[in-house]
Each structure stands twice: as C-alpha cells, then as structure tokens.
From Swiss-Prot:
Family annotation (Pfam families): Copper-fist (PF00649)
GO terms of biological process kind: intracellular copper ion homeostasis; intracellular iron ion homeostasis; negative regulation of superoxide dismutase activity
Entry coiled-coil feature ranges: none
Localisation per UniProt entry: Nucleus; Cytoplasm, Cell cortex
Source organism superkingdom: Eukaryota
Entry comment, domain topic: The CRM-I motif (C-X-C-X3-C-X-C-X2-C-X2-H) and CRM-II motif (C-C-X3-C-X-C-X4-C-X-C-X3-C-C-X-C-C-X2-C-X-C) correspond to cystein-rich copper-binding domains.
Residue stretches spanning the membrane: none
Name of the protein in its database record: Copper-dependent transcription factor 1
Binding site for Zn(2+): 11, 14, 23, 25
Motif, CRM-II: chain positions: 455-482
Biased composition (Low complexity): 85-99, 835-845
Known role: Transcription factor that regulates copper acquisition and homeostasis, and which plays a central role in fungal pathogenesis during neurologic infection. The transcriptional regulation exerted by CUF1 is intrinsically complex since it acts as a dual sensor of copper levels, responsible for expression of a set of copper-specific copper transporters, CTR1 and CTR4, at low copper concentrations, and 2 metallothioneins, CMT1 and CMT2, at high copper concentrations. Positively regulates the expression of the copper acquisition factor BIM1 under copper-limiting conditions.
Native source species: Cryptococcus neoformans var. grubii serotype A (strain H99 / ATCC 208821 / CBS 10515 / FGSC 9487) (Filobasidiella neoformans var. grubii)
C-alpha cells in the first residue's frame, strides 16, 4: 500500500481487485483511495464553528468559491513541463486532460483521472518543488521541514478545498467563473480577522506567491487574508537570504540590476544576481572541495556555496527552547546533487580578513553599488591579486563537485595586468626563457649564483666575510674539541670509525694557524726493518727506538704501528712507568692529545726441547704459557724489588720475575683480535691471584684484523732479537713461532729496568716457585691457592667451569693423523678425530661413583672460549710430596681405576672391580663385555662358569669396524708437567705419559706392538697408532681390567 501524507494510493488494477492494502506498484498511475462512507459537506472550519458552544452561524458550509480549484488543476503546471518535452504527444495529452471532464465513480472504483499519473515520480518532483520554494515565505526565514509536505503544497489552506482560501468570507453574490486569471479574487471581499483567517498557514501555494509578487496586489483582499509573516515574534533570528521577498529591497535594486548571462534556470521569477551579496567566496569553496593531498572531497557542506543551514530537530520545539533559554543549533547538511538552487559565490581569494574596498563578499566599507568603481584590481594589499568585487553565479542542476569547481573556475576573473612602474624582484615571469639556459644571460639579468655552504660542513664559526678555513675543516674554527672524548671513543668505536675520525681530526689544524699545519713528512723517518718471517704481510714503518729511553718505553713504542712524537730532550724519569711514551697515529695530526699506549707483551725464551713440538692440525692449541715447565731453566741471578706505578694503581712486585700487567687503554680495533687477560689481584701474602677467565669477545682467526697483529709481532721479535744476547735461547733454532690464536696475556712481561740493558729472559722456575709450587711437586702452605679450590669445595664446582689446556704433543707423535685428541682415555679407546668443538665428555652415568672425579664429571669447554692458569694439584700426604710414577707391575697403592682416590681400608681386588664395573652399551659388545655378562648370569643363577669366555671370531672384525669413538673425559693432569726426578729434557716428554698410565702385570719394555684385549687386536693396534703404541710402551697382551689410569 502506498501511503502519502496519511492518504492511501493504489493503482487501478489493485483497486478493482480489492487489493488496495497489498498494492506496491509505484510505477503505475496512482489513484487516491477514498474513505468509506458519505463524503463531508462542510469544511473543517465550519465544523469547528458548529461544534463551538452556542454557535449557530450556519448549518451549511458556504465557504470558498463556488467552483474551487481541484488538485488536478494544481498539477497541470507540473505536467506542462513534461508535455513540452513531447511536442506533439504532450500537447495533445494536455488538451485532452483539460477537455476531458472528471466522471464521478462509485465506491470501490478508481476515478477517471489518476492523482499521480506517473506514480512516485510526480511525488518526487513535488518534493523538489517544495525545496525550491524555501526562502520565499516568512521573509527570509527557512521553511520548516515538517511543513514542506505534499499535503501542505496541494492544500495550503486547512479547509482542504485546494484553491485560494475563501473561508470566513460572506458570499454576497455568486462568484463568476475564472475567465482570465483563475486566481483573481473579487474586489468586494469582506474583511478578515487580523489573525489571518481560519487557516493561519505559513505556507503559501505557488499561485499565492505569484499574486503577491505583483505591485497591484499588495492591498488586495488576498494579501489581507494571508498577510506576510513579518511579525517580530515569529522570527527567532533574522538571516540574510539572496532570495528575499522584501519588496522594498527588491524595488530599490531592480532599476540598476542586470541579468547575468550565466543563469540558465527555467524559473521565471528570479532575483537579480549581480546585486545580491554572496555569502561565501571562492577560497572557502576550494578549501572545502579539495583535500590537502589534491583529491576531491566526497561531499561539501551547504554553507560553502552560500545555502543556509537546516534547523535541527530541537528547534521545532520553540516554546521549550524559549523557556530553557537555549538557542537552537542549525545543522550544516551536505550539499545534495544534483543541486536545485541557484547560488552566487564571490571571487575573493583573500580570506575572511580581506580589506579590499568594494569586495563582493567582505564589504567592510559599505560602498553602495551605485558608487562602486573598480579598476580591475584591488591594489597591492590584495592577497588574491584579482577582482574581489566580482561574483560568480552557479546555476542549479550541478551533478557533482567536479562540475561545480569547473563552473566556478571558468568564471574567475583574470589577474590584473602588471604595472610598468613597479618591478617585483621575485617575479620570474618578467625574465626571458634564455635565463635558464645560459649562465651569461642570467648574469646579465642580475641573477648571481650564491656560493654553496661547503666550508666546515655548514657549521663554520668564523665571522662573516673572514673565513679562512680549508675545505677539510671540521667546523671548530679555533680550539679543536673533537678529541675531548678520545678515551671513550677508543673504547666504543671500531677500526673503520677511528680511521674516519682521524681524517676529520687532521682537518682541525687547518683553521688554527700556520704553526699547526705541519705534515706527516716531518714525523715519519721510515726505517723498515728486516722481517724474520717469510710472510706476505705488510709491515708499516716504525719509528726507531730512542737511545735515551728505558726498556719499557721501547716496548711501548713497538706495540702498535704508531709513531713517537720527536722530543728534543726527554725528561728524566724515576721509574719505568713514568716514562710512558705518547704515541700518535700516523693519520692523526701533531695536535692530537697524546694517549698512553698499551702494555707490551713480553719476550719469552724457548727451550731447545720445545722447538720441535708441532701441533697436529685440528688438535688442541698449546697451553696458556705455550710451553711445558722445566725446573732446569736458567735462573736469574739477583733479585730486584720495587714499586711500579701504573696510572693510579700501585702494586707490589714480590719475587725475582713476577709477571705484571699494567692496565692500559685499548681501542676497539685492538679488541678485535685481543683476548682480555685476567687481571692479577694481589693477595694478602703478596702473590697475584688469577681472576675468573675472560671470555673471547671476537674471533681470533679474522684475516683482516690479524694482519696488523702479525706484522707487529714480527717487528717486535725482529727488533728485540739483536738486544737479547744474554738469553738462554738456542740461536740455531728459530725464534718463538707467532700464533694468531695466542692470548696477549700468555707472555708474562720482563722485569723492566731503568738502564739501557737488554731484556733478561723469563725464568719459569722462579715464577713457579713464587706462586707456591715447590720442585718436589708440593704447593707451599704459606701461599694461597688461586687456581684450584680446596678439596672440601670440589663437589660444589659448577659443571661449566673451564679446564686447563692440554700439554704439547711430543715430537714422536707428529705422525698421528690430524684431529687426534691427546686425552688419556684416547690412549686406549679413541681412534676417531674429535669434532670441531673439541672432545665431548663421557657421561657420568657410565662411570661408578667411586671412580668419578669432579674434573671427569664436568663437560669439556673448548680451549678457544676459556683460559685459566694451569691447575696446581695437591697430592695426598702419604705420597711424601712427590708425584707418583709407576715403576712396577703392581698397581699404585691408594689409587683405583681412572685415578680416583680409594680408602685405605678398602681392598682393591679383581672380584670387587668386576662387580662394580658397568658395561658401556653405547658401543658394540666385545669379548670382555660378554665375559662380564656371562659371569653376572652365572652368579644370578647360582651356576659356575669359566672366568674367561672366548669371543666370537666371526663377529670380531665386524665389531672392530663398527666400533664408534668413545666419548672421552676432560684431562685431569696439569698443563705444565714438572719432573722432580729427571733433569734431562729429552726424557721429560717420554716420562710424561707414564705418570698417568699404569699397566698391571705388563712390563714397559715389552716388544709387542699395540694393546690387545684377550689376545685380539685392540684400538691402539690400528695402523695409525702403531708407532704411538711403541712410543708409549703399551705392548703385549693384557686384559680389560689390567689397565690402571690415574691422575695427580
């Protein structure tokens, strides 16, 4: 059912089929559905009068014209526009519509003419007409949306007769038919109440407005019956509208007004546009229509085109707003497209603060239109540089925002012509195009290119016009402050950052004067020494050592490829630490603040017995000291005790040759291949204690960072070789081999003297005695133990504590294949090269508790990642303070398998050992394991069996081939082996392994090669280990339980 303004409409077929409530055919002609019952014979006004108390005015309604205008006549004007489109068909349809009389139909039948011939299309057109009429009534006040309905437009009077309201008018004579003007009112109309008649409607039909627009109808009875709503009590605010119906304003401007050609609206009554003040300008429209990113907005408000805003919902309740003292707020709705209003926009682009005289939008000077004269420009103060008095008319029917902008932009006035008496230097439009093509033409026209701010990186501090900086100036332009943070930068910046800073620092001297511009040629006296190592590394030139400086200064000067600042007369020093030389990097200038250099690494002698040791590829690196101890080294003659001062740290030196490391400042480039050495802590007894091992901060095998270190070490050894004449080193052997993986703290420094004597070689035996190691293998009780905790604290050692490196491999083992791990367990069980991360530790679950030592239960840490001092072992008191050496076929009393100490009350027998042994199931079972299994089964079943079982011959070879490498335990023997009984270096290495391995019942001098298990070939009998078995003396036949391994 189609319901319009509380009236039912339906199509013809639905009315005939009695389906009015179900009709939804909005595209068909709609007929009004009459109410049931007898039609009313009186108007609403007469009904109200009759119902009033004591009223007897009339019993029959005589109000209105005798032939009132029907609804069909009102819609005739609407249909005329569509009829004009169809010239032939539309004209005939209009003639037939006016000629065909309306036939009354009975109830339930549609009328002869539909109310809306085109369905809801007519309803929409009437609604659009209602929007077009806003502003015509109530003297510039917006028509309320609730009153702009179809019913109010079709029936402006509440008497619902459809035509001009004639209620309350006494008919004196019959009214004649409308001959000329159908809306003409009789002259003899009676007076109407001052209140406005019976309807009191504020909405007038289109014909009423047309009648009131004529000057002759101002004093007519129609105007009196419907007076203009100009009473002040009906207006809350007085708003200006370009479509004002004020006749006096309209008449005052009608004589001088002219029609603008841009208007194309079909409406006949249109106010003159040129004299209507625009409510908006072009700048406000462009700001609302164009976003900041240059795109068009999706919608624009109505106010930007000059249309008034719509009242809010709360504004309808006028009485409530007046009582509460609230003001109604209008709603600025978006502009609907296509537009149905004609608007005027000002061409001003200055904004709200425009001060141009005669501006159409911002007329602050109140210049009358008759006196307004404009020469085409607003003057120099105009921000828009155009004619602000110009107006831009925008007709209705605009379809989009883009079309609105195009219409407005096409009517913007052109910019004013340039005046010849004034020249704007910033206006480049007056220059010829050849200025941008030729520099000569640009210079002729007065365009001078400015010098770019290249000096000091844009931070020049010189006075204007007095800059004497060079191109490489850092920007200080005076006292350079670039190196104030040098100590911090050496700790934080890398090698490349330091070199980049040196380039900047060297440019600081360009601004300070002639005395600071000395080059590097005065500093450099290149004397390239002969390199002793046949390497391809480049050795940078070094400054020759001054003859009047002590040995410590010489070490400092040769530590890194640096240059000493030449001093004509070095000051006298009282101690070696006071004579630190101030080194300057070659790329730094002479004006750099000197920095104390790093403590040099000392020179260590090499024994003749150690020069032949060659480390196999893939094996462990040498120990921390790089050598095995020797009690026969040449001792120093004489002692010297003094106080060394290094910065603010004073440390006492006790002993003949105690190593001492001076804390020094290291740059990050040095740390790239240096390992932080453990700082020595002075104990109460005067003995240095090693702190926790420092971790590696950078890979040591970096070729880029190691090249400089290798070159420095080569230079150091070559420079000190000539001055080291009193050393005990064998001149026939080469000097100490340079290893890139060696630690910087692995070389204890020499005792420095104040004279010019050569450095004395380091005495290892004296050093070991100073730290508490006696020649008989004991630790002195008056010295605190630094590297090994007490025996009571051994179970509390964390499992991640690093261990000491392994001793060097003897020369007789050089033919062992690479990767062979020289731990004592590998002497019997391991023949597979260890992995890159070092040998793994044997699980603690495979070793009995009584055969497990704290060192053996710890996992092995790769020697590259941790460094400690060599552990010093304290043996039981019953050994007499000597390292036990196996010299007989019996097992050493007090020690069991794997070297774990055993109680004296416990008897170590073969039967108890067999009961305590555990079979390792991680490797294939051999004959010994099968024998133990058989013995266990016999004991469990109560039976007796032979103690020896013959292994399977068929499975022996297969088991040996598939035998995996057994995981080994960490070494528990010290890194530096001190032989208390033998002084011959040739026999030290031969006796080293006999100190840790005992063979029960097998003489050392056996001629059998390899180690056998019950007569079969063992692991040590492999082809790669034949010579190793001979060297170690592990020949002959022995059972699995005959090997005894222990450690001190």
């Amino acid at each position: 059912m189609v319901l319009i303004n509380d009236k039912k409409f339906a199509c013809e077929k639905c009315i005939k089929g009695h389906r009015v409530s179900a009709c939804t055919h909005t595209d068909r002609p709609l007929f009004e559905v009459k109410k049931k019952g007898r039609p009313s014979t009186q108007c609403r006004h007469c009904k109200e009068k009759r119902k009033s108390a004591g009223s007897s005015v009339h019993t029959k309604c005589q109000c209105g014209a005798t032939d009132p205008k029907t609804l069909k006549d009102i819609l005739a004007s609407v249909n005329a526009a569509h009829a004009a489109a169809n010239e032939s068909g539309g004209a005939s349809a209009t003639a037939n519509t006016s000629a065909e009389p309306e036939i009354e139909t009975r109830k339930g039948q549609p009328g002869s003419k539909p109310t809306f011939p085109r369905g809801l299309k007519d309803v929409h057109e009437i609604a659009a007409a209602a929007n077009a009429l806003q502003g015509w009534g109530e003297d510039d006040q917006v028509v309320k949306a609730a009153e702009r309905t179809v019913q109010a437009l079709l029936n402006p009077c509440k008497c619902e007769l459809g035509g001009p309201c004639t209620c309350c008018q006494i008919k004196t004579k019959p009214r004649r038919k409308h001959s000329g003007h159908e809306f003409e009112n009789p002259a003899s109309a009676g007076a109407t109440p001052p209140g406005g008649g019976c309807c009191g409607s504020s909405v007038h039909s289109r014909d009423d407005v047309a009648t009131r627009n004529s000057p002759t109808s101002i004093n007519s009875s129609e105007a009196i019956h419907h007076p203009p709503q100009t009473a002040p009590m009906l207006h809350k605010t007085r708003l200006f509208s370009p479509y004002s119906t004020d006749l006096r304003r309209r008449d005052s401007s009608s004589s001088t007004g002219s029609k603008t050609p841009g208007w194309a609206s079909p409406r006949a009554m249109r106010p003159p546009v040129s004299r209507i003040k625009p409510l908006t300008d072009m700048r406000r429209l462009m700001n609302a229509a164009v976003n900041q990113d240059g795109t068009l907005a999706s919608e624009i408000p109505r106010s930007v085109v000059g249309l008034p805003t719509l009242p809010g919902i709360e504004s309808f309740n006028t009485s409530a707003n007046l009582e509460n003292g609230e003001k109604s707020k209008d709603v600025d709705m978006p502009l609907a497209f296509p537009t149905s209003e004609d608007v005027v926009i000002g061409a001003c682009m200055c904004g709200d603060d425009c001060s141009c005289p005669g501006c159409a939008t911002h007329d602050h000077h109140n210049i009358s239109p008759s006196n307004r004269t404009h020469d085409g420009s607003c003057g120099e103060s105009c921000k828009g540089h155009n004619d602000c008095a110009h107006s831009i008319p925008i007709p209705s029917g605009v379809q989009s925002i883009a079309q609105l902008i195009c219409i407005a932009a096409s009517q913007v006035p052109p910019p004013p012509p340039n005046r010849t008496d004034s020249l704007n230097p910033h206006d480049t439009r007056i220059l010829p195009p050849s200025v941008s093509l030729s520099e000569d033409v640009a210079r002729t026209m007065g365009i001078v290119p400015l010098k770019p701010l290249e000096c000091c990186g844009g931070k020049c501090g010189c006075p204007p016009g007095e800059c004497a900086c060079t191109k490489q100036c850092c920007g200080c332009c005076g006292e350079c402050t670039c190196e104030k943070d040098e100590d911090t930068r050496m700790e934080e910046e890398g090698e490349y950052t330091e070199s980049a800073r040196d380039v900047t620092t060297s440019s600081c001297g360009g601004c300070k004067g002639k005395e600071k511009q000395s080059g590097f040629s005065d500093m450099m006296s290149p004397q390239i020494p002969q390199s002793v190592s046949p390497t391809s590394y480049h050795v940078p030139p070094l400054q020759p050592k001054p003859l009047n400086l002590p040995v410590s200064t010489i070490h400092h000067s040769t530590l890194s490829p640096s240059f000493n600042t030449p001093q004509p007369s070095p000051p006298a020093v009282s101690s070696p630490a006071d004579s630190l030389s101030m080194a300057v990097h070659p790329s730094n200038g002479p004006n750099v603040r000197p920095v104390p250099m790093i403590q040099p690494r000392p020179i260590l002698p090499k024994r003749a017995s150690d020069t032949g040791l060659v480390m196999p590829q893939g094996s462990r690196p040498p120990s921390a000291l790089g050598r095995s101890g020797s009690m026969t080294a040449t001792k120093r003659s004489g002692t010297s005790t003094g106080v060394r001062r290094s910065n603010s740290d004073v440390r006492k030196v006790v002993g003949p040759s105690q190593p001492h490391h001076r804390p020094s400042i290291q740059s990050s480039s040095d740390r790239s291949f240096y390992i932080g050495s453990p700082s020595n802590q002075i104990a109460p007894g005067g003995v240095p204690m090693a702190s926790a091992p420092s971790q590696m901060t950078a890979p040591l095998n970096s070729a880029d960072s190691n090249s400089d270190l290798l070159a420095f070490i080569q230079q150091q050894w070559s420079a000190d070789k000539t001055s080291n004449s009193n050393s005990d080193m064998n001149p026939s052997h080469p000097t100490m081999p340079v290893s890139l993986t060696a630690e910087p703290w692995a070389f204890p420094p020499q005792n420095e003297t104040t004279d010019d004597s050569a450095p004395v070689p380091f005495d290892l035996d004296a050093f070991l005695m100073s730290i508490g190691v006696q020649p008989d293998g004991e630790l002195r009780n008056d010295r605190p133990l630094s590297s090994q905790p007490p025996q009571s604290l051994m179970p509390n050692i964390p499992p991640t504590q690093p261990i000491a490196p392994l001793p060097p491999i003897p020369p007789s083992m050089s033919d062992v294949r690479p990767g062979y791990d020289m731990t004592f367990a590998n002497f019997f069980l391991n023949s597979t090269p260890s992995g890159p991360s070092g040998p793994s530790a044997i699980p603690a679950t495979n070793i009995p508790s009584r055969h497990t030592t704290p060192q053996a239960s710890r996992p092995l840490t790769p020697p590259e990642s941790s460094f400690t001092e060599p552990p010093r072992w304290k043996f039981p008191g019953d050994l007499g303070g000597e390292i036990p050496i196996w010299n007989g076929p019996e097992a050493l009393e007090g020690f069991g398998v794997l070297g774990s100490p055993v109680s004296e009350k416990e008897e170590v027998t073969e039967e108890s050992q067999n009961e305590k042994d555990i079979i390792d199931l991680s490797k294939p079972l051999d004959s010994a394991a099968l024998t133990k299994i058989m013995k266990a089964l016999e004991k469990q079943g109560g039976g007796q069996s032979s103690s020896q079982g013959a292994p399977s011959v068929a499975n022996t070879d297969q088991q040996l081939q598939s035998l995996p490498a057994l995981q080994t335990v960490p070494p528990v023997h010290p890194a530096s082996v001190i032989s208390p009984t033998r002084a011959d270096p040739a026999h030290e290495l031969d006796d080293m392994f006999s100190q840790f391995v005992t063979l029960d019942g097998t003489p050392i001098g056996s001629n059998n090669d390899g180690l056998g298990l019950n007569g079969g070939p063992g692991m040590m009998a492999l082809p790669t280990n034949l010579s190793l078995g001979d060297e170690l003396g592990f020949g002959g036949e022995m059972r699995w339980d005959q090997a005894r391994m222990w450690s001190n």
